[in-house]
Amino acid sequence: MQSVMSDCPHREKLGWLEQDHLVGPSLFYNFDMTQFCPKIIRDITDTQKSDGMVPTTAPQYVSFGNLFDDSPEWGSTLIIMPFQYYEQYGDSTIITRNYNAMCRYVDYLTSRSKDGIVSHGLGDWYDVVEGGKSGFCHNTPIPLVATAHYIYDLKLMTCAARMVGNKTDETKYSTLYNKVVEAFNREFYKPCLLYTSDAADDRIS
């Protein structure tokens, strides 16, 4: 936690973004994030591409290409962390100041979706499988994890649009949220098993 939220101090020193929102509740509970959080979001918006895509690392010192550049679970930090800040401090400044960038990212995810399902990314990274093989998501389909983040982003963007007084965007994201939830349920909801895929761990969860 010095300038950049690095993955670890000994090997992966880049600012991998998923950790920021995943440990966000702990960060906001234990530390004064009033300076660091806005800096993280500035790094993200500085790194954001012209089409709205948010790379997996910010600052982006190196581009890994393909999946390692673009994953919803990582990029969604631009949407999720400003709301964690708002929930902790009651300050919506980060949301209102970065609203356009947040819109561009969610609109980018929409452009990558097919029938409401987002299918790209790294998924549930480093889940454990028999034999110790790690890395890419093995137990849970990438579309399930990616689309779940997309849904959460749409829900938050509906709130963000309301905060800035943009009725058109509020209706847009609210309507899209409902449509994507329906698509998610059609794709992944099984009445006897709740939300599931063919993976055993999914059925258990």
Residue ranges and their predicted role:
Residues 1-111, 117-122:
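Substrate-binding groove/exosite segments of carbohydrate-active enzymes
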Residues 6-10, 93-95, 167-171, 192-197:
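Short, surface-exposed loop/turn segments at secondary-structure junctions
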Residues 117-125, 147, 153:
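Core alpha/beta catalytic barrel or barrel-like domain that forms the active/cofactor pocket
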